[in-house]
Amino acid sequence: MTFRDILSVTFEGPRSSSSTGGSGAGGGAGTVGPEGGAVGGVPGATGGGAVVGTGSGEDNQSSTGEPGAAASGEVNGSAAVGGLVVSAQGVGVGVFLAAFILTAVAGNLLVILSVACNRHLQTVTNYFIVNLAVADLLLSAAVLPFSATMEVLGFWAFGRTFCDVWAAVDVLCCTASILSLCTISVDRYVGVRHSLKYPAIMTERKAAAILALLWAVALVVSVGPLLGWKEPVPPDERFCGITEEVGYAIFSSVCSFYLPMAVIVVMYCRVYVVARSTTRSLEAGIKREPGKASEVVLRIHCRGAATSAKGYPGTQSSKGHTLRSSLSVRLLKFSREKKAAKTLAIVVGVFVLCWFPFFFVLPLGSLFPQLKPSEGVFKVIFWLGYFNSCVNPLIYPCSSREFKRAFLRLLRCQCRRRRRRLWAVYGHHWRASTGDARSDCAPSPRIAPPGAPLALTAHPGAGSADTPETQDSVSSSRKPASALREWRLLGPLQRPTTQLRAKVSSLSHKIRSGARRAETACALRSEVEAVSLNVPQDGAEAVICQAYEPGDYSNLRETDI
């Protein structure tokens, strides 16, 4: 039973006899030959399927593994076009595989365009994901169409030379895809284990060197058959398959799958252990000091600022006095253990499910030919590995909300998202508090005045996003005398969870890179004296304080936090 027989309905007529495993004479309109033999793991064509025939039925006596066929017209549910007879089975398989290939191409293109069109997604980690998408896209566009054509026609129709090139590109793309998954696992472990040092450890130059090495290794693995490390070439050019030479099968399986799989499993286990330990430490810190243990504070020390007697913001400066204001951002912690376990199970489980059967059967069948699976089973296993390239765009990028939003913008033909300055964000949510007897005023300026003390916070507790009623109640409450104005950058959450370290390192990197941009400074730049980022250590009282140049923060955007 072939791959086509599994996915479609059989339309074959009575079979004729054959002494060599090939087909019988194709004289009758409803007579078809049985399946031919297989060379190199590729099955012979099925009678009544896609075959070449130009003479009469009696003239179309086939050689071993080559079915006979009528020259034109219809044969038992088959359609003849230009000398090729394509069965209804082949049409069904072709439609299924075409949808499969288009899905893989579209998904990987979305990943690449999302990063290319959104500057805030252009990070080192996402560069590795883009490399994975490039490998999968190359596989989907340059390899799978020819594999699908061979499944539909039942034979290889592109010649011996192109068969060798196709097989090499197949191994190249699959190996690069698997090694990209391995690189992503190492990158995520480094990002979680050494979050504050991550920008210095994983620079763009190092990432480029890693990707170059990755493709070099994939190239070395793939060129073996082109240099002669393969089985004897079959005489019939209509057969094309992967090389099953024992030495190369073991070498390619170890380098392309078993070593990367070991690294992936170890790295993701370490990620889970570190995330679990960090989550427990942060939860313990919150119990000891509620509201402080998980808080990361970006402080901007400004010159004197005052609030007018009516409660409206003022910009009066006072000599010898410095009013310290802060942008207090309650960033997200690591995922809870259950969510982390679920995500890692999906990542590792799908990878192993897709590739392990193929890389188990390939060396086993090379060493022990009597243990090789049937044609139909091997074809399913073969395409299951290709399926991993189709689901990769769903597993990795779609686990990020930013990627999901970028996908939606691309589907709506909105390539770029307008990025507003941090100081112009959510102006309608701010409030001023004074000691005046009157209620606090809440105008809606789009840009905060120079020297104004700002606070960006996310408060834990029940509830969802702010509503007009809750905003009115907050603005009408009496407060002690202060000059605090608050922007709610993040909505209230049930728990302040997920990815504390990654957010801190990203924010730190954005602040550092601000000084290298040649953009106009924001309105507060002239009033700022110092910028610092305070990060509490896990489960400890000490705080790590990182100072920055006053001008470095000027290009900090809403999307950076």
From Swiss-Prot:
Membrane topology reported for the UniProt record: Multi-pass membrane protein
Taxonomy, superkingdom: Eukaryota
Transmembrane segments annotated in the record for this chain: 91-115, 128-153, 164-186, 208-232, 246-269, 343-367, 375-399
Main location per the UniProt record: membrane
> Which residue stretches are annotated as topological domain Extracellular?
1-90, 154-163, 233-245, 368-374
Residue ranges annotated as Cytoplasmic topological domain: 116-127, 187-207, 270-342, 400-561
| GO BP terms in the entry | adenylate cyclase-activating adrenergic receptor signaling pathway; cell-cell signaling; negative regulation of the force of heart contraction involved in baroreceptor response to increased systemic arterial blood pressure; neuron-glial cell signaling; norepinephrine-epinephrine vasoconstriction involved in regulation of systemic arterial blood pressure; phospholipase C-activating G protein-coupled receptor signaling pathway; positive regulation of cytosolic calcium ion concentration; positive regulation of MAPK cascade
Q: List, alphabetically, the InterPro entries matched.
A: ADR_fam, ADRA1D_rcpt, GPCR_Rhodpsn, GPCR_Rhodpsn_7TM
State the UniProt keywords alphabetically: Cell membrane, G-protein coupled receptor, Glycoprotein, Lipoprotein, Membrane, Palmitate, Receptor, Transducer, Transmembrane, Transmembrane helix
Where is the protein localized?
Answer: Cell membrane
Question: What tissue specificity does the UniProt entry give?
Answer: Vas deferens, hippocampus, cerebral cortex, aorta, brain stem, heart and spleen.
Q: Where is lipid attached as S-palmitoyl cysteine?
A: 413
Q: Where is this region: Disordered?
A: 10-71, 452-481
Composition bias of kind Gly residues appears in 21-56
Q: Name one GO molecular function term.
A: identical protein binding
Spell out the Polar residues composition-biased ranges: 467-479
One Gene Ontology term, aspect cellular component: plasma membrane
- One short Pfam family name for this protein? 7tm_1
Please describe the post-translational modifications of this protein.
Palmitoylated. Palmitoylation by ZDHHC21 may increase the expression of the receptor and regulate downstream signaling.
Q: SMART domains given for it?
A: 7TM_GPCR_Srsx
Subunit note: Interacts with FLNA (via filamin repeat 21); increases PKA-mediated phosphorylation of FLNA.
Its family remark reads: Belongs to the G-protein coupled receptor 1 family. Adrenergic receptor subfamily. ADRA1D sub-subfamily.
* Function description: This alpha-adrenergic receptor mediates its effect through the influx of extracellular calcium.
Q: What is this protein called?
A: Alpha-1D adrenergic receptor
Point out the gene that encodes the protein: Adra1d
